[in-house]
């Protein structure tokens, strides 16, 4: 059974276009109609939920022949209404590309042609205003137009890539050409010598000449580009560029090496500073430990004296307690009516005085012994401090002498490298004569005193306290003549 025509005479037309469905949660709203976003095509309503599927016809081979009446719109069985299939609908609005993407990827409207009778071709819409596109999209569009105006239109996919012109001979090519020419010259030189020797033998001479001719032709071919000024100039420019690049690389390598050496020197200086700090900390700890040991030794030596002093104090307390006890017993006996004789009191008092004198002598002896021990320990501690101070001063003096020797070696050269008979020895003796002769010192000071000026003089300065070191070399030529340490 044939299907009835889609639109008959009494059948209503397609429904009006419905507004697009609301965007899902979190998606931007669909854009308004514009050249970049044409309105969606109307679709045939179907039983499918949501957007309906487009109306598709069966293939032409499966369609029955339609009569003229049916073609003119009449109804009847076994005929189709000759309606062309509508184009495929565009993707959903939320999946459309942004209006700032590449023009090659931007969807274009369908080509002009007969559309469905119920869907006339949409009119050309004007460009969307700024408030429709948004500030970000409008700025993006302006940036793209500016880039195209400055740098030209970007090359589309499939466009032929312009071929780069030959930039000139490479150094490898020139080197290979020169090496081949040098080999040919060597062979021709050998053949020339052989030709001179084979002048008497005509056949051998002809054979050698036949070998020489192609070599000469090849040599002329090899040397022909070298006669062109442009070829030679380009080769020289490339060679100069390579030379400058190598110089830059060497300079950078030299700078990196100097940086590494400076970093190594800084690391050595830091290590030396750390070592000095550690030595100082160790010395402080050792000094404190030594003081504690001396104090412990002094306490050990003085412990016996202090013990004896404690015994004398205890004996004094015992005598005081005995005197108090006798007084209490005497009072108790007096209450009972018993009175001791006066001789007993005298004897008791005599013994107490004798014991107090003995304890006093012992106490004075122990105090003198303690003072002697303290003086002895303080003397030992003072000697130890003097030895430490002398050792420190000796180290400082050695350090100063080493620095002085280093400065003198920079000024006058290393004495190990320059013996006494060297040409610079008189100058060394002249500049160091004040260290060995008092008249020379007085004369030098007198010469310096001639330049004394008041302290408020604008050009006055102090006499240098040490050697005036020379400045660094001002150029490379002078640096080659100076040995830097």
Curated annotation (Swiss-Prot):
Ranges in coiled-coil conformation: 232-335, 362-411
Pfam families linked to this entry: PDCD7
Binding partners and assembly: Interacts with RBM40. Component of the U11/U12 snRNPs that are part of the U12-type spliceosome.
Entry keyword annotation includes Glycoprotein: no
Comp. bias (Pro residues): 12-48, 82-96, 109-130
Any one GO cellular component localisation term in the record: U12-type spliceosomal complex
TM segment ranges: none
Function summary: Promotes apoptosis when overexpressed.
Protein's name in the database: Programmed cell death protein 7
Residue ranges with Low complexity bias: 49-71
The organism of origin for this protein: Homo sapiens
Keyword flag Repeat: yes
Disulfide bond residue pairs: none
Region of interest called Disordered, as start-end residue ranges on this chain: 1-133
A single GO BP: apoptotic process
Compartments, as annotated in UniProt: Nucleus
Family annotation (InterPro entries): Apoptosis_promoter, PDCD7
Annotated keywords: Apoptosis, Coiled coil, Nucleus, Repeat
């Amino acid at each position: 059974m044939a299907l009835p025509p889609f639109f008959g005479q009494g059948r209503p037309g397609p429904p009006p276009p419905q507004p697009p469905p609301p965007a899902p949660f979190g998606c931007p709203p669909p854009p308004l109609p514009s050249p970049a976003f044409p309105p969606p095509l109307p679709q045939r309503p179907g039983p499918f939920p949501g957007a309906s599927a487009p109306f598709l016809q069966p293939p032409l081979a499966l369609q029955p022949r339609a009569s003229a009446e049916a073609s003119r719109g009449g109804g009847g069985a076994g005929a189709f209404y000759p309606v062309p299939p509508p184009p495929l609908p565009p993707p959903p609005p939320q999946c459309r590309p942004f209006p700032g993407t590449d023009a090659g990827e931007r969807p274009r409207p369908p080509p002009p042609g007969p559309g469905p009778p119920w869907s006339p071709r949409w009119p050309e819409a004007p460009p969307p205003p700024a408030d429709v596109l948004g500030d970000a999209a409008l700025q993006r569009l302006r940036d793209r137009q500016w880039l195209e105006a400055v740098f030209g239109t970007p090359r589309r996919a499939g466009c032929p890539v312009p071929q780069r012109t030959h930039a000139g001979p490479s150094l490898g090519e020139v080197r290979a050409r020169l090496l081949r020419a040098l080999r040919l010259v060597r062979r021709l030189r050998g053949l020339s010598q052989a030709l001179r020797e084979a002048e008497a033998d005509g056949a051998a001479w002809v054979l050698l000449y036949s070998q020489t001719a192609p070599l000469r032709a090849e040599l002329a071919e090899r040397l022909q580009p070298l006669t062109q000024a442009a070829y030679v100039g380009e080769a020289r420019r490339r060679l100069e560029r390579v030379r400058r690049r190598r110089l830059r690389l060497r300079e950078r390598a030299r700078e990196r090496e100097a940086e590494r050496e400076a970093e190594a020197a800084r690391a050595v200086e830091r290590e030396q500073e750390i070592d000095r700090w550690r030595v100082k900390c160790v010395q402080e700890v050792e000094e404190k430990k030594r003081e504690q040991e001396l104090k412990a030794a002094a306490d050990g030596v003085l412990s016996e004296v202090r013990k004896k002093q404690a015994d004398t104090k205890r004996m004094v307390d015992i005598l005081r307690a005995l005197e108090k006890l006798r007084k209490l017993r005497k009072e108790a006996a007096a209450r009972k009516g018993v009175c001791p004789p006066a001789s007993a009191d005298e004897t008791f008092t005599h013994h107490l005085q004798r014991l107090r004198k003995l304890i006093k002598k012992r106490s004075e002896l122990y105090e003198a012994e303690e003072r002697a021990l303290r003086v002895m320990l303080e003397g030992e501690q003072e000697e130890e401090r003097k030895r430490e101070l002398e050792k420190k001063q000796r180290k400082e003096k050695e350090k100063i002498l080493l620095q002085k020797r280093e400065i003198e070696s920079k000024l006058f050269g290393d004495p190990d490298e320059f013996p006494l008979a060297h040409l610079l020895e008189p100058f060394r003796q002249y500049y160091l004569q004040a260290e060995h002769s008092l008249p020379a010192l007085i004369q030098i000071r007198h010469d310096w005193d001639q330049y004394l000026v008041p302290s408020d003089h604008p050009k006055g300065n102090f006499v240098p306290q040490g050697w005036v070191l020379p400045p660094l070399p001002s150029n490379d030529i002078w640096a080659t003549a100076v040995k830097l340490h």
